[in-house]
Amino acid sequence: MVDKRESYSKEDLIASGRGELFGQDGPPLPSGNMLMMDRIIKMTEDGGSHNKGFIEAEFDIKPDLWFFDCHFVNDPVMPGCLGLDAMWQLVGFYLGWLGGEGKGRALGVGEVKFTGQILPTAKKVTYKIDFKRVINRKLIMGIADGEVYVDGKLIYEAKDLKVGLFKDTSAF
C-alpha cells in the first residue's frame, strides 16, 4: 500500500530509503549523505504547467555539510551534480508515490543550465519538479523539468529529466 500524501517529513524520506514508505517493491530514496532533501512540502498528481504532476521540496543548508569540506578546500560550494541528483531523486520518488515498483535509475537529462551556486552561507535550497509525462508500461518512466533555487533565487534549470523504475537491474 502506497503512503500517498501531499507532504513528507525528513523522517518519512529516511523511511523511504529503508523501503518502508512505498513497500519493499517501491523505489527507495538514497540514504545518509546522498539524501539531498529534508522535506517535501507539496506533491500533486495533476499540477504543474503540464498538468501531469508537481513536487516542491526543500533542503536546509548548514556550513558543516559533508561536501563543503572537500569541494573545494578554501572555496566551499555544493557540487552542482548533487542538485541534479536531487531532482532525479524526486522524479523517482514521484513514480513510487504513483504506485510504481522497481529500483529507480536516472536515465538522462536533455539540458542542464547552472547560473548560480550553493555556498555554506545559504539557508535553504528549494527544488521544483514539473512533470511532462509518466509512462507506465513494461518500463515505468517519468519525464520532468526541474528548477533549483537557493534562498529564493533560481540557480539551476534542467529540461527532460528522465528516471526509470526497473524490477531487475542486473543487466542495466
UniProtKB/Swiss-Prot annotation:
UniProt-listed GO biological process terms: unsaturated fatty acid biosynthetic process
- Keyword match Isomerase: yes
Any one Gene Ontology molecular-function term assigned to this protein's record: (3R)-hydroxyacyl-[acyl-carrier-protein] dehydratase activity
Q: Which GO terms describe its cellular component?
A: cytoplasm
**Keyword set for this entry?**
Cytoplasm, Fatty acid biosynthesis, Fatty acid metabolism, Isomerase, Lipid biosynthesis, Lipid metabolism, Lyase
Indicate where this protein is primarily found: cytoplasm
Q: List the disulfide bonds.
A: none
Q: Which residues form the active site?
A: 71
Q: Where in the cell is it found?
A: Cytoplasm
What role is this protein assigned? Necessary for the introduction of cis unsaturation into fatty acids. Catalyzes the dehydration of (3R)-3-hydroxydecanoyl-ACP to E-(2)-decenoyl-ACP and then its isomerization to Z-(3)-decenoyl-ACP. Can catalyze the dehydratase reaction for beta-hydroxyacyl-ACPs with saturated chain lengths up to 16:0, being most active on intermediate chain length.
The family assignment reads: Belongs to the thioester dehydratase family. FabA subfamily.
Oligomer status and interactors: Homodimer.
Protein's UniProt name: 3-hydroxydecanoyl-[acyl-carrier-protein] dehydratase
Give the organism, scientific name.
Answer: Proteus mirabilis (strain HI4320)
